[in-house]
Amino acid sequence: NLANTYTGGTILNGGTLTIGADGALGTEGDIIFNGGTLAYADSAAGEDATGYDISSRVNVGDGGFLNVSVLGAGDTVSWAGLSADVMGAGTTLTKTGAGTLALGYAGNTLAHLTVEEGTLSFMGGATIGVNPNNATIVRVSEGASLALSGGTVNLHAQLNGAGTVTIGTADTAGLVNISNTGNTNFTGRLELVGNGVNMSTNANWVAFGAGNTLGGGTVFIDGKGFHFSAGTTAANFEIGAT
């Protein structure tokens, strides 16, 4: 838990490695994920590692697995330096733990994305899945949340699960594009948030790919300037603002 003289690097082959203090894995060298889970301890337990951003040192091979847990329900861990340069093609990202993991990462090399617990957020827009391949599966479990905020959000993936997916923020407008090659088996809550400041140039487009369906969850719209095109939906709609 305590910062130490260990400088790195680190190879995680299996099990769970829990860090409880800033600097616990040193400040140099790659942190290589060959399996297992990296967990941030609950900050309420004593030492606090939530400000310990090791993302620029993460190394995941092609087809690898990046499993991250933030254990504290009120904790937020921000990884600003995660990039395609350190994420192998076809990486599977899994988020567990009751806290929030905030990523500054476009996400376009992900094969699969799973939010089992807590919240996973992508800051400054995101592209998840590569169009037209559309082989990516995004699953958000019941009680968990995926937040995609700011700029352009492209979700070229099959969306599954019963959790909450929030796209946009109250003070920004952007483009939301949801497309996949098959039906979206999502029974949770899809929240579309934005203000459409200039509808002529910054309208919040929500494009469901032609021939695709959105499952029987709830679509909550809180904002203005949203336009729907193509596709079908079996979802219930709630309008929070006009």
Q: What are the language-model segments listed below?
A:
Residues 1-62, 76, 80-88, 100-162, ...:
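Surface-exposed loop/turn positions within long extracellular repeat scaffolds
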Residues 66-68:
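Polar, low-complexity export/assembly segments characteristic of proteins
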Residues 71-75:
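Extracellular beta-rich ligand/substrate-recognition surface
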Residues 92:
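Active-site and glycan-interaction determinants of carbohydrate-active enzymes
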